[in-house]
């Protein structure tokens, strides 16, 4: 007698695991919306649960507290920012070719433009990620500063190769330049959040480029 076929889920992750991941994702996205509209301090776990449309107690099946979900919210927000701002700039293929000063400046200018466009279209995101969330506690400050260090180190890698090839002057500290370029992206974003428009942004970028370009080019190229 043939044994009846047993019904099973087949390959892949168990349904419970998939449902858990889906619910966690929903809660993270809901917390992101709540934190960027109400502010982290004013928001509650009940607000997050209501945003998803679930009971208050269900939140605690997935996260222990409002602070516990914050790390995932920060990761979610940073992923959005980096994807929209950097694009494929930091992909391995983009890091392997020799960069020129003009290309570096174009990359920086493009990043500034995209950050300002985000500040126009989603000002709550920029306000939260740049100003509100970093001040919550030391642990979060360390994480965000660590990300800045990674980005600055990536720029340093670009610049070090350009120094070796003679494109960029060899008497500048490329690590410091990486941090300077990151810092220079903040003022136009703040101006945009305060209502500054395209003309103001373009003037800032042109001024920064006029200062940066001769300061980075090799002495031979400037002569």
Cite the ranges covered by each PLM segment.
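C-terminal peripheral helix-coil segments that are non-catalytic and often amphipathic
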Residues: 1-11, 113-117, 121, 153, ...
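Generic hydrophobic, amphipathic alpha-helix propensity
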Residues: 19-32, 48, 69, 73-77, ...
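Helix-turn-helix
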Residues: 26, 34-68, 72
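Amphipathic alpha-helical interface segments
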Residues: 30, 34, 51, 58, ...
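Short helix-capping/turn signature of helix-turn-helix
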Residues: 63, 130-136
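Hydrophobic alpha-helical connector segments
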Residues: 72, 86-121, 174, 178-181, ...
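Amphipathic alpha-helical packing segments from all-alpha helical-bundle domains
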Residues: 79, 83, 118, 128, ...
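Short, hydrophobic secondary-structure boundary micro-motifs
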Residues: 127-130, 167, 171, 193
